């Protein structure tokens, strides 16, 4: 076959600059001021009238205002801009200009607008929606600015996690998702039929396998999904969530605690440095995050119980109740004044008043819920008995005493897992360590020093009514070069919830799985 008869190449060889994309990302506009660029994305919102339109375009990397004067574009472009609907896909070409007033600090003076994909009646409009509606439309709600910001921060947290461990010589390893044994108790296992009539379970934790890998590689961490068939409908619980679990050979409890606090501080600092725009989009008060410096306060379980039952805690809760009642009264007074003003107001003022009323109603609902809960939390704290595990409400109250995460250590052995080492100075206690996030968010890390005594572990497996044969491989770790070792697990979604200021973990993972939700 002659060259003339050869088919045209499928791929263009013209990639001397190494680029793949033939368009510009919104996050890169700072590099193109006074240049003409082409953007591709979706219409987030719009406004304007007469001979000018303001289109807010989003592309996953950010948001930008595109200014479309009718006299600066051709008829086809104006027809698109004048009739475009929310979430239509667009290609927009124009000149980049810096403008501090615009979203992201830049805007596009448009030369041309082309529709790539039409949008129908988009259900998730800018108005207020109930949480059930939003969760039913989670696949679309993810496109909103708030959810964009949460997922961008989640991504930065994930990259910060890998940075932290890789810089410290850890090996990332992978634990199995299908297991033949329980880790955190049999009552929360998702079980399924395996081959040859054997039972298998979705993993509750990668910790046991992490211990095996720590004995092979020294310092390891796993990063994967975990599953708990726990019928809890609280703001902190999911049935499927992601855990980061380091395991370290030759680490004792104190070394473990120091690593945990350095880890949390590193994550927070990474988000503060790199996610300013996203935190602002969420209206997150960063003053509390800026307090996250090591060392963290440390209290024993015994001291935590004393603090819960103290007069100081009772007075603190009473003061919160009083402050919330005052805030509620002020908000209701403002709402009444706004309703009086609204009757004589112009249309644009009415829109502002209506938007403010939505904010007031939402905050009043939050206050009323808190006022219903706080008396119960006070009673729970005042009557807390030694030997009980801290509930979410107890953790919330404890964190109100501190301006940064607090480390709680040495728990009653009965409330900790079978593999936890006992305190050599008090056999009632396990060498556990938890990290509680401030601002009422509670536990984000749980861990401790692992038991190394073979006979003790056998006794604990029997005491917890677990089948020893499925733990034979785990017990082998104590027979061949057993050493002191420790580890912990950080719940990714709880950490994202705290750092982003979300009230519920369901907003911190793209498609949450709860006891009430398996779709979308």
Regions found by a protein language model. Give the residues of each.
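Class II aminoacyl-tRNA synthetase catalytic cores and aaRS-like
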Residues: 1-520
């Amino acid at each position: 076959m002659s060259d003339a008869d050869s088919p045209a190449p499928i791929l263009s060889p013209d990639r001397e600059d190494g680029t793949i994309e033939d368009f510009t990302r919104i996050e890169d506009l700072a590099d193109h001021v006074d240049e003409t660029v082409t953007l591709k994305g979706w219409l987030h919102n719009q406004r304007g009238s007469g001979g000018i339109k303001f289109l807010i375009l989003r592309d996953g990397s950010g948001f930008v205002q595109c200014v479309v004067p009718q006299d600066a574009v051709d008829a086809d472009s104006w027809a698109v801009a004048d009739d475009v609907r929310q979430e239509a896909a667009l290609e927009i070409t124009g000149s980049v200009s810096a403008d501090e007033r615009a979203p992201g600090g830049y805007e596009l003076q448009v030369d041309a607008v082309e529709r790539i994909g039409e949008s129908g009646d988009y259900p998730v409009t800018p108005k207020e929606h109930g949480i059930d509606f939003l969760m039913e439309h989670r696949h679309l709600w993810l496109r909103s600015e708030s959810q964009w910001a949460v997922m961008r921060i989640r991504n930065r947290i994930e990259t910060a996690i890998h940075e932290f461990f890789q810089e410290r010589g850890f090996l990332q390893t992978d634990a199995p998702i299908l297991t033949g044994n329980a880790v955190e108790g049999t009552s929360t296992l998702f079980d399924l039929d395996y081959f040859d009539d054997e039972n298998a379970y979705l993993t509750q934790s990668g910790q046991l396998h992490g211990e095996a890998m720590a004995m092979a590689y020294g310092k390891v961490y796993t990063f994967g999904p975990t599953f708990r068939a726990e019928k809890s409908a609280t703001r902190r619980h999911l049935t499927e969530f992601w855990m980061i679990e380091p395991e370290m050979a030759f680490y004792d409890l104190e070394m473990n605690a120091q690593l945990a606090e350095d880890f949390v501080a590193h994550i927070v600092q990474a988000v503060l440095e790199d996610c300013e725009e996203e935190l602002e989009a969420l209206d997150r008060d960063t003053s509390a995050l800026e307090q996250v410096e090591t060392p963290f306060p440390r209290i024993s379980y015994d001291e935590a119980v004393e603090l819960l039952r103290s007069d100081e805690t009772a007075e603190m809760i009473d003061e919160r109740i009083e402050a919330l009642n005052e805030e509620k009264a002020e908000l209701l007074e403002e709402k009444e004044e706004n309703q009086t003003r609204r009757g004589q107001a112009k249309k644009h003022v009415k829109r502002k008043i209506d938007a403010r009323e939505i904010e007031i109603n939402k905050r009043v609902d939050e206050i009323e819920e808190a006022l219903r809960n706080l008396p119960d939390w006070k009673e729970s704290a005042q009557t807390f008995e030694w030997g009980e595990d801290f509930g979410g409400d107890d953790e919330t109250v404890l964190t109100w005493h501190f301006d940064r995460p607090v480390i709680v250590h040495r728990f009653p052995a009965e409330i900790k897992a079978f593999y936890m080492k006992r305190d050599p100075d008090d056999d009632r206690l396990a060498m556990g360590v938890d990290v509680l996030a401030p601002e009422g968010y509670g536990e984000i890390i749980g861990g401790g020093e692992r038991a190394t005594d073979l006979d003790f572990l056998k006794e604990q497996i029997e005491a917890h009514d677990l089948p020893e044969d499925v733990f034979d491989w785990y017990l082998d770790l104590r027979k061949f070069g057993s050493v002191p070792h420790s580890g912990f697990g950080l719940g990714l979604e709880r950490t994202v919830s705290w750092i982003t200021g979300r009230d519920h973990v369901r907003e911190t993972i793209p498609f949450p799985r709860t006891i009430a939700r398996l779709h979308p």
